């Protein structure tokens, strides 16, 4: 039932049998006493966050069996990440990082408990692991709440109605957070919430105060002087207690916070790539307890299920951004969590005397030990992320714990070979409670008396493009659902009965007022499609329910991480009075009107057809089959499509169609000499970032589209660029905003070389290892200058 990890450099033996030679010279031995009688706090779990927001969006659109496989890797015990806590966003119709999630109550008196995908996700998690703990937290809220004031009586009722929706879905919510995520908290309202929960049958729901930005433990200070607030608060929490986007080497918490005696959580961590975040996670999960007595650790986010042009496109435990192909990739981050989650359970106890830093030195690594409260079972999790040599660990078990056989599981986090991740490497029978093992640098180990662990075997199909033509008439959806592949960026675009006498189902923007935002508030819009789409026309039937405007978007690419209104895109905007414009936006939100005019008024409650076409640098806007205007602009060569409205406009859309052919030639570029891929380091979207080699991982920063204009696009809006338009050997290959310049044009040749149109030089790396920089080079015929598209 267990898989053995090939090439794992662990030596584990009974002390009496002698020590097996390790693969590297060991440092001085570290002695660890596993004492079941040690004091320690109660473990609450390791989990992840779905929300903040839209990052799980495409998961629900996956076909079976891939959707079920992904869910198994996330939630099924003994299979993958085996999450113990799932925190979800209480949708607020507003963008909360990577998109907007719909509210269960768009306006006062409204209630629909089937909107969005978080209910479905919680149901799927519970079906696989009935013991998983569920947490609810709002990032933003509909504008009717308190007439724009977050902490209000309206908010109390809003929370209660959300819990009622959970009950309709057969879900019991374990925790609610009494704050607006990372924005604001209120001691008085927390007391109001606690009283309301008790009065309405939810006394078992625990209240979390905090979820604040790093270093902000304001609620902890407040409870020291406010008895009612203290009594209303079950958990104090904070975000990124080990540092934001950090290696998570230190996770300090003020002594005064620990001294409150309250349960402490590190309730959001990570924000890192689904593979590259594994080492920080390995450190942080142990060190939040060692340094700060925090008993829960949540990774943001759960899954990277959004398209590569959206902020944080590869952050999560699994990459799942292609429901049209079924492709997914389980990251090293998932296995880093599994080393704790598959060997413990909420309610276990930390053993403080059996936890610490190897040899008393942080650089050697850390270890924590937890025990079952009802049996003699225990698990010790050891990480050696920063160690420079092998270390011998001498362990001695005492204090009523099992002295029976222990099982060793290991992951080599220095390796990108999936075979080196989460393997069962040894079984040890202690002698008199004593045993030893040798821990190698850069590894994560679990030493346990438990059984039942496993590594999932489901495999992903190959990647594939979403090709043209594409269309959706929206018929066949249930009311209140999000149309397939359509991702809300602001507002709430959901299926509804069509108006003005039209039969069937349409998509309606249903948020009728400005929200209480989390990010900058902008007009509602939603996106769909392939960032490589280039030559196409997007068409949609539109109906304005009241005075305002609607819009079509095209060639939509990168988006600013802090402002969803700052996006590379073209727009056709038209109002009920007939005023229209073709506009260009960018990631600095510099909106340029390329052409404008006035057409026959659209009016309200009548259907019209809008079209926005792209052919090379020619952009054509049409209304009801008549051309409104044509412009020439080559700023953005490719991108997605979208629909949108003015703020508060509850417009309808039907018969969305994108006509054209192909989806662009999108693939990784695999170097023939190294088998590594052309990569934008750290998923950067910053102009001037030099590309390099990296192990192929399917991330959006490795997906290159060769356009008909000979550009190599990444993220749908950045072009591979010969820096400074230089034609000299040694010129850095970088990413830059697309300009249509010849220094951004490339020939993909039959012999596998890629040559610059302006320079004639070959694209080549400065080595074969990870991070080898890529430059223009004199062509030599070497395999190092040849690339395979796959």
Residue ranges and their predicted role:
Residues 662-685, 701-728, 744-770, 786-790:
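Extracellular glycan-recognition/adhesion modules and their associated mucin-like linkers
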Residues 29-173, 178, 187, 191, ...:
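N-terminal catalytic cores of secreted or lumenal carbohydrate-active enzymes
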Residues 623-642:
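Short, solvent-exposed beta-strand-to-loop segments that form ligand-recognition rims
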Residues 356-404:
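Carbohydrate-binding surface patches
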Residues 383-492, 496, 500, 514-516, ...:
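C-terminal beta-sandwich/jelly-roll accessory domains of carbohydrate-active enzymes
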Residues 266-344, 348-362:
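Aromatic/acidic polysaccharide-binding cleft in carbohydrate-active enzymes
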Residues 606-620:
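Localized edge beta-strand/strand-to-loop motifs within extracellular or lumenal beta-rich domains
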Residues 511-581:
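Secretory/extracellular carbohydrate-interaction modules
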């Amino acid at each position: 039932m267990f898989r053995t990890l090939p090439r794992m450099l662990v030596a584990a033996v009974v002390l009496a049998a002698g020590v097996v030679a390790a693969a590297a010279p060991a440092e001085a031995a570290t002695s660890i006493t596993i004492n079941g009688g040690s004091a320690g706090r109660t473990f609450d779990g390791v989990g992840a966050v779905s929300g903040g927001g839209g990052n799980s969006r495409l998961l629900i659109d996956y076909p079976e069996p891939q959707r079920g496989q992904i869910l198994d890797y996330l939630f099924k015990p003994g299979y993958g990440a085996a999450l113990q806590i799932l925190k979800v966003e209480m949708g607020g119709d507003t963008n909360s990082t990577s998109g907007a999630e719909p509210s269960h109550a768009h306006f006062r008196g409204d209630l629909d408990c089937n909107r969005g995908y978080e209910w479905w996700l919680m149901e799927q998690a519970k079906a696989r692991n009935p013991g998983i703990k569920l947490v609810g937290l709002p990032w933003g809220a509909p504008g009717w709440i308190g007439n724009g004031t977050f902490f209000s009586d309206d908010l109390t009722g809003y929370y209660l109605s959300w819990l009622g929706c959970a009950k309709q879905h057969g879900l019991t919510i374990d925790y609610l957070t009494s704050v607006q995520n990372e924005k604001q908290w209120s001691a008085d309202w927390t007391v109001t919430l606690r009283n309301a929960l008790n009065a309405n049958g939810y006394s078992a729901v625990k209240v979390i105060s905090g979820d604040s930005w790093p270093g902000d433990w304001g609620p902890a200070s407040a409870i020291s002087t406010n008895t009612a607030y203290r009594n209303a608060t079950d958990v104090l929490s904070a975000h990124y207690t080990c540092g934001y986007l950090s290696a998570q080497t230190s996770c300090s918490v003020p002594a005064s916070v620990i001294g409150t005696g309250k349960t402490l959580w590190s309730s959001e961590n990570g924000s890192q790539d689904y593979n590259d975040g594994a080492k920080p996670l390995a450190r942080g999960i142990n060190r939040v307890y060692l340094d700060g007595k925090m008993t829960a650790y949540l990774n943001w986010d759960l899954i990277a299920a959004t398209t590569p042009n959206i902020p944080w496109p590869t952050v999560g435990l699994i990459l799942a951004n292609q429901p049209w192909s079924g492709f997914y990739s389980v990251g090293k981050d998932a296995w880093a969590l599994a080393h704790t989650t598959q060997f413990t359970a909420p309610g276990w106890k930390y053993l403080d005397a059996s936890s610490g830093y190897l040899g008393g030195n942080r650089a050697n690594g850390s270890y924590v030990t937890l025990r079952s409260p009802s049996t003699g079972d225990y698990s010790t999790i050891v990480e050696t992320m920063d160690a420079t040599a092998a270390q011998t660990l001498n362990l001695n078990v005492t204090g009523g714990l099992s002295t029976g056989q222990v099982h060793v599981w290991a992951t080599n986090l220095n390796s990108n070979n999936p075979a080196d991740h989460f393997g069962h490497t040894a079984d040890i029978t202690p002698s008199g409670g004593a045993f030893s093992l040798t821990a190698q640098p850069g590894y994560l180990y679990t030493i346990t008396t438990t059984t039942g662990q496993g590594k999932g075997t489901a495999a992903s199909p190959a990647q594939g493009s979403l090709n043209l033509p594409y269309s959706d008439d929206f018929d066949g959806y249930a009311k209140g659902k999000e149309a397939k592949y359509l991702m809300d960026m602001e507002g709430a675009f959901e299926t509804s009965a069509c108006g003005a006498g039209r039969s069937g189902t349409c998509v309606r923007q249903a948020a009728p007022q400005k929200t209480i935002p989390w990010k900058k508030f902008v007009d509602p819009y939603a996106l769909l499609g392939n960032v490589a789409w280039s030559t196409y026309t997007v068409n949609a039937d539109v109906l304005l329910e009241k005075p305002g405007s609607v819009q079509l978007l095209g060639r939509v690419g990168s988006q600013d991480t802090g402002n969803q209104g700052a996006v590379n895109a073209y727009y056709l905007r038209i109002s009920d009075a007939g005023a229209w414009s073709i506009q260009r936006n960018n990631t600095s939100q510099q909106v340029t009107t390329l052409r404008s005019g006035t057409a026959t008024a659209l009016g309200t409650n009548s259907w019209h057809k809008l079209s926005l076409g792209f052919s090379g640098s020619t952009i054509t806007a049409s209304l009801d089959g008549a051309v409104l205007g044509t412009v020439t602009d080559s700023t953005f060569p490719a991108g997605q499509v979208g629909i949108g409205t003015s703020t508060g406009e509850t417009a309808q859309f039907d018969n969305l169609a994108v006509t054209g052919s192909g989806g662009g030639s999108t693939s990784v570029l695999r170097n023939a000499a190294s088998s590594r891929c052309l990569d934008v380091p750290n998923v950067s979207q910053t102009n001037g970032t030099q590309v390099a080699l990296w192990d192929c991982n399917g991330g959006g920063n490795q997906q290159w589209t060769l356009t008909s204009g000979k550009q190599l696009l990444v993220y749908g809006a950045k072009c591979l660029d010969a820096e400074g338009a230089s034609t000299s050997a040694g010129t850095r290959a970088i990413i830059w905003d697309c300009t249509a310049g010849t220094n951004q044009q490339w020939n993909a040749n039959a012999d596998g070389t890629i040559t610059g149109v302006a320079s004639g030089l070959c694209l080549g790396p400065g080595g074969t290892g990870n991070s080898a920089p890529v430059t223009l080079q004199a062509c030599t015929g070497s395999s190092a200058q040849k690339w395979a598209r796959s």
